[in-house]
């Protein structure tokens, strides 16, 4: 009873801290569940696909970013964070397989193990936030709670994005700069205070004592220099956009103590020179490793010292050149300059985005009104964090391709500055200089603690949980179970049988998740000690958002080619599959009916992986067949549920229930098996298999 009373009477800070630990546990748990949601193809194709495929000699896709002729992705960090840990994991897996027949290498491991590494790295953001709060005497409980409950950490922090590493490195850099600023301000203040005392001292003994005290002050001018320069080099090679995030942080580090008697431009220039000098070892290491990996530099050339500038690869420069090509960036999507500010910021940070934009607008207004006395001091933590938010935001808005994940490094400074507003409201005191009736009404009804304080934390929770569920478990969530199912098909298929998979209106399928030994490299048989090359038996065709009529033409071409090989001398058997969102099932049926493919192509629905939402094929909000809405299973042999005329039925609960059922059933990824029949043309070419549906 006493423990219950103590638990109920604990302070708000303790409640926030205990809630944070719950969210931290959820972050770890989401790694092992695992999250089925597929946020963006770059999660796999910028690191995991290549590293896992190379290490385990699996079939994998090497995107244009890893092209040996002009590589734009550095291999050092993915190699250190994935390839080396995979070696230890493989050793443990082989031992457990030999001793207890446990198989730890498969689709699940290829997803979970890299995510576990990146999730552990994500906790460095929490540590840096806690450290800065302790250094500056700030409340860390609510800030940690905001960080831990953010969908950015729950989703992006547990995924293998280069943006997640960029966020962690920016957090470390901010932590080091903040510590250096505090130490410099403290030491400079004490030094100038002692110098004044020294000048006023009358006796020699007192001057000696003060001189000893001044010399005992700790060094501060070059604090954390090596660590900061190394982080900057690693950040730029990870993502060259780190230049935009790191530049204001390094600038504040260089300006520490400027304007005092102790720090002059000589110190400023010395810091710049030594910073560049300390960055050289990391710079040489990254360039050397990338040059070896992309085969621009060989050990033979290194031994013979036959070297030229062409032997070295500088991937950040290649990245910048590629992104300066407007046609290249346009292929990924062109966005207006206001997307980051008006869409991505509110999407990532919801109420805290509004708080930060409002606070920055207030700072700009006071600056242009020359109200300098109420502005934060330039060499303060508020100025540092504000610069870390809005300087990169401004320059990133000038780039025509804008995605929410590009702003992940803004998370740390934004939460540090504005997380307390989740409990205090947008403004605890009247923020305007003039007391105008309209401004007073605006403050009382929206900004004040009484008006906004009780609701902001609730809005924060609801929005972040909703976005975590959507991107973590619904968005493109059928791709992972599809890969696991195809992996099982290939493992159990008859010998000398080719498997062909056609996908449409879904994200690219990472080949390494299917767990197929590569046909492009030599494999080693440990029993016979012989090397062999495995013939290719899996083919994948990805057609993105291709219209269904054009998709059927592709299906006919692929099936025709397979039939030719099957009837040829090799008698090559095959299995042909089609994976499309369930929302397109009815459109697929209509396209088949109106094409001549219906006379010989038989589509058999094998499974529907739930849930799955492709924004490229959004479910129909109104069922196509109002008499009996049951998508995607309305295409039975008798076409039950179809209407010759789609009249609007009476508005009723039964009708709403059917419409809702239609919408829910469309939230899936349908897998069809296609075979060719030469029999009498059938009235229906899609049939439902006897197999049960698989809920992913």
UniProtKB/Swiss-Prot annotation:
Its main location: endoplasmic reticulum. Pathway: Glycolipid biosynthesis; glycosylphosphatidylinositol-anchor biosynthesis. Pfam families: Glyco_transf_22 (PF03901). Its EC number is 2.4.1.-. PANTHER family: GLYCOSYLTRANSFERASE (PTHR22760), GPI MANNOSYLTRANSFERASE 4 (PTHR22760:SF3). It comes from Drosophila melanogaster. Belongs to the glycosyltransferase 22 family. PIGZ subfamily. GO terms for cellular component: endoplasmic reticulum; endoplasmic reticulum membrane. This is GPI mannosyltransferase 4. The chain crosses the membrane at residues 100-120, 125-142, 149-169, 185-205, 227-247, 338-358.
